[in-house]
Amino acid sequence: MTRQLAIELSGRNIRVNSVAPGFIDAGMSAPIYEDKKVRKTRSEAVPLGRLGTARDIAEAIMFLDSEQGSYVNGHEFVVDGGVVHSLLNQLPRD
């Protein structure tokens, strides 16, 4: 959907991107991380070694909305501390 909208709206100088958050300790998910075992397990699953914050997500969005991000269009920004890429390494190779 993001890519298609980016294609359709780019002629109007409208950029469309999306942000896909990982394990974020904020808002509705905050109660989940009150459990110390869950917090530890999920933090250890993140290559950066910590849960994300609302600020991490906001910074990605601010970049996309800034002059520095003005040539980015049609992309999904995965803000997960590297989880997606680390999981790919765990898949069986045969």
Functional labels for PLM-detected ranges:
Residues 21-31, 85:
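Short, flexible catalytic-loop segment of classical short-chain dehydrogenase/reductase
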Residues 32-46:
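A short C-terminal helix-loop "cap" of Rossmann-like NAD(P)-dependent dehydrogenase/epimerase domains
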Residues 7-11, 70:
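Alpha-helical segment proximal to the catalytic Tyr-Lys
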Residues 46-57, 68:
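A conserved structural motif in NAD(P)-dependent oxidoreductases
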Residues 2-3, 58-61, 65:
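Short-chain dehydrogenase/reductase
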Residues 62, 73-94:
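Short C-terminal tail/terminal secondary-structure segment
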Residues 15-21, 25, 65-68, 78-80:
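Conserved SDR Rossmann-fold cofactor-binding beta-strand/turn motif
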Residues 11-14, 75:
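Active-site loop of short-chain dehydrogenase/reductase
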